[in-house]
């Protein structure tokens, strides 16, 4: 299994399993199909690693119970649980390109008997490009897009006396991606459409919004 960039301009990545493209690999969120359609190329970056407890990978044709996409295999993401003993987790990360990332999770019981519990997950990251637009190969295009990502998820769990469980929750994500030639700005988008014959700068601006609930 390998991960590679399928589009250098937008920063889209895909998983290759058994030599086939990522569209043949099914990604599950606790056995629920996610990352279909336009969100598939960015699916991995939409699930912060600090939100996860484990990742389960199975290769080969799987059951169609959760969908028909699992031709080469399945990747199942297991998140932190509302019943976790760790009540508060905060993680701050800063890489050598001065890209900050903040993750927070808090799990707590809502009732004294702990039958009802919840967990709140927050994530924020920002490509600052404070050291300049990365262009290591000198082709005039940014090697990485300028990305601003914010995500919040809230999960609930109710456990009855007989052991039956009811789960529900939601996740909202907002992301802006700006890429293309160095020094390209979002305000130049109209110039790229109308003045392309005059050497206007080329760039790409992508806005993704995602809301799902279960």
Regions found by a protein language model. Give the residues of each.
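Short sequence motifs at beta-strands and strand-loop junctions characteristic
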Residues: 8-9, 67, 95-98, 144-148, ...
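Extracytoplasmic
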Residues: 12, 22-24, 39, 50-52, ...
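Hydrophobic, lipid-facing positions within transmembrane beta-strands of outer-membrane proteins
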Residues: 13, 71-73, 86-88, 100-104, ...
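Periplasmic-side early beta-strands and strand-to-turn transitions of outer-membrane beta-barrels
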Residues: 84-85, 107-204
């Amino acid at each position: 299994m390998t991960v590679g960039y399928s589009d250098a301009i937008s920063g889209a990545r895909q998983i290759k399993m058994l030599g086939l493209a990522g569209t043949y690999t099914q990604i599950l969120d606790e056995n629920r199909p996610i990352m279909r359609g336009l969100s598939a190329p960015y699916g991995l970056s939409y699930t912060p690693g600090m939100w996860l407890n484990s990742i389960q990978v199975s290769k080969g044709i799987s059951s169609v119970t959760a969908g028909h996409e699992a031709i080469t295999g399945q990747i199942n993401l297991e998140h932190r649980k509302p019943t976790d003993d760790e009540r508060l987790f905060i993680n701050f990360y800063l890489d050598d390109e001065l890209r900050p990332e903040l993750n927070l999770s808090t799990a707590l019981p809502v009732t004294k008997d702990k039958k009802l519990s919840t967990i709140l997950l927050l994530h924020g990251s920002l490509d600052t490009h404070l050291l300049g637009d990365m262009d290591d190969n000198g082709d005039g295009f940014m090697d990485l897009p300028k990305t601003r990502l914010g995500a919040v998820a809230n999960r609930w769990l109710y456990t009855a006396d007989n052991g039956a469980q009811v789960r529900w929750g939601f996740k909202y994500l907002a992301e802006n991606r700006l890429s293309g030639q160095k020094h390209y700005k979002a305000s130049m988008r109209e110039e790229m459409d109308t003045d392309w014959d005059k050497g206007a700068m080329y760039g790409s601006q992508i806005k993704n919004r995602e809301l799902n609930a279960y």
